[in-house]
């Protein structure tokens, strides 16, 4: 883009599929970034075009492994050293978000550490979606634009025109999120009370509420091994639910998740494309968040341009009317 005051969008390796759709929505080309991998496992990044004085948006979800976070940090560092005006990290899925507090002695708080790493690397702003805990925004010393997948999930659910709908939360911790959907549709809220034997293993689960002859929609922020959500679906079906489907923001779907979903009572499970889903499961559907992120980038850039123009006007006026001019 030739305008000196324009923005540029670049993508890490793992999120290129989404960055291309964001750029298509914005009507701009995806910037040229090269990731070089070395034989010892290290890698480096380089911008193949000038970004001096530009606002740079770096798209990269920090999943499925730590290489994606490291790649993002290197992108930020390279942008800072190349004299970018503002560096905005666009992280649709923020990994390590489940490590947001000390739930037992002598454990790390991974979410705070990752926030510190991004800040020290040099970001001026973060755009993300559906953090596991809203308070993670406070871990950053820079502005955080926290988006919600409900922007694409709600219209999809409306298009289904489900009668006798009930919104369900797979655990007590997610009740606030699920209640937002229940209020929007004006329908009852059902809770699942679960106990875990260990991480990713549900020991027992009870339903709080009536699901008999209802079309149940389970709402969650992410699905990892799918143990909780498939167990909830099976129990609700046994309790007389007409249909059970699930909607979640982030498609982590690790380990046996795809097989569990395929063999469960779920009609379908709907995700956004914050994370690429490369496995095969007939019940998985992904909705794109590209337009939502593109609009956020557009608004962030509009505000940035307003501040820049205002600053230039003030500088010009002071220079023009200075008695020392």
Regions inferred by a protein language model and the residue ranges of each:
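PRPP-associated nucleotide enzymes
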Residues: 1-310
């Amino acid at each position: 883009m030739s305008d000196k005051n324009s923005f540029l969008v670049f993508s890490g390796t793992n999120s290129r599929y989404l960055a291309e759709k964001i750029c298509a929505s914005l009507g701009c080309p995806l910037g040229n970034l090269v990731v070089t991998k070395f034989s010892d496992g290290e890698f480096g990044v380089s911008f193949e075009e000038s970004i001096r004085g530009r606002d740079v948006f770096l798209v990269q979800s920090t999943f499925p492994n730590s290489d994606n976070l490291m790649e993002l940090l290197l992108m930020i560092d390279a942008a800072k050293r190349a004299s970018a005006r503002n560096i905005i990290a666009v992280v649709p899925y923020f990994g390590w978000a489940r490590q947001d507090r000390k739930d037992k002695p002598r454990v790390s708080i991974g979410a705070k550490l990752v926030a510190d790493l991004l800040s020290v690397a040099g970001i001026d702003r973060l755009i993300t979606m559906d953090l596991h805990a809203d308070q993670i925004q406070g871990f950053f010393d820079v502005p955080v634009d926290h988006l919600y997948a409900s922007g694409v999930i709600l219209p999809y659910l409306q298009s289904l025109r489900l009668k006798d709908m009930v919104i369900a939360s797979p655990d007590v911790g997610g009740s606030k999120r699920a209640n937002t959907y229940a209020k929007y549709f004006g329908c009852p809220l059902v809770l699942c009370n679960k106990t875990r034997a260990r991480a990713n293993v549900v020991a027992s689960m009870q339903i709080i509420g009536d699901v008999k002859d209802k079309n149940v929609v389970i709402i969650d922020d992410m699905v990892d091994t799918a143990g909780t959500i498939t167990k909830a679906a099976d129990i609700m079906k046994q309790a007389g639910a007409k249909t059970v489907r699930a909607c979640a923001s982030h498609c982590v779907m690790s380990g046996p998740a795809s097989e569990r979903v395929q063999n469960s009572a779920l009609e379908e499970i709907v995700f956004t494309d914050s994370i690429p889903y490369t496995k095969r499961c007939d019940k998985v559907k992904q909705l794109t968040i590209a337009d939502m992120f593109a609009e956020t980038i557009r608004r962030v850039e509009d505000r940035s341009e307003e501040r820049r123009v205002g600053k230039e006007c003030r500088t010009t006026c002071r220079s023009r009317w200075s008695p020392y001019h």
